[in-house]
Amino acid sequence: MVSFYDREFSSRLLIGTALYPSPKIMQDAIRAAGSQIVTVSLRRETAGGKTGDAFWSLIRELDVTVLPNTAGCKTVREAVTTAKLARELFGTSWIKLEVIADNDTLQPDVVGLVEAAAILIRDGFDVFPYCTEDLGVAMRLVEAGCKVVMPWAAPIGSAKGITNRDALKLLRERLPDVTLVVDAGLGAPSHAAQACELGYDAVLLNTAVAKAADPVVMAGAFRLAVEAGRNAYEAGLMEARDFASPSTPVVGTPFWHAVS
């Protein structure tokens, strides 16, 4: 089980709802992923009119927990306003907080992110901040009151996988009591498994499933990868070595096999 703000879930795979070829494929992919939490853009919901109503009906049919986000916000004020609107629309204090610094890389504005997180937490929000893998930023977010931190593996939609393994490993070691979710940059199920092998509590992805040739099958593949990665972490991975180490014992080896 994984805990998000005192709520427990069995699935460690969070999934986005954008970019799918059709609403039906989105539904089927979310079911195949076994996800219990889905991210939803406030801008999509409010700008869609009747389309937005239909989309919301599809989400309700899935019986999942909705995590609204502030995607596209570039300032603290814009992010805070969007979060408050999302709370009214979706009836939840949960918010995936994004404050973007650069349109090309979609890199978080970490200064604005910490400021916005502090404001929202004081206003009763449960904040899921999208950030870089910087330990200092993560610590500031925790100090502000975040019980969940969501560092990227790589830029959003890049599909590069984990580009700074050591930094993500350090975050896990230094923040043992914080729920950590790798968010963004994952492109293959193996990337998700690697994140879970590092001890991350969950992963969040969207494009890797939505843009796959078969999103439904890919969603199932990610589900299995997350389960495998978590099982491996809990089982205890052996440490990598610089030199070979025989797996077959030499005790009892016939003398004619001995090396002179």
UniProtKB/Swiss-Prot annotation:
Gene3D superfamilies: Aldolase class I (3.20.20.70)
Cellular compartments annotated: Cytoplasm
Enzyme class: transferase
Record flagged with keyword Metal-binding: no
A Pfam family it matches: ThiG
GO biological process entries: thiamine diphosphate biosynthetic process
Residues annotated as catalytic: 96
Keyword Transferase: yes
InterPro entries from the UniProt entry: Aldolase_TIM, Thiazole_synthase_ThiG, ThiG
Role description: Catalyzes the rearrangement of 1-deoxy-D-xylulose 5-phosphate (DXP) to produce the thiazole phosphate moiety of thiamine. Sulfur is provided by the thiocarboxylate moiety of the carrier protein ThiS. In vitro, sulfur can be provided by H(2)S.
Family of the protein in this entry: Belongs to the ThiG family.
Alphabetical list of PANTHER family matching this protein: THIAZOLE SYNTHASE
Complex and partners: Homotetramer. Forms heterodimers with either ThiH or ThiS.
Protein name (record): Thiazole synthase
Taxonomic lineage of the native organism: Bacteria, Pseudomonadati, Pseudomonadota, Alphaproteobacteria, Hyphomicrobiales
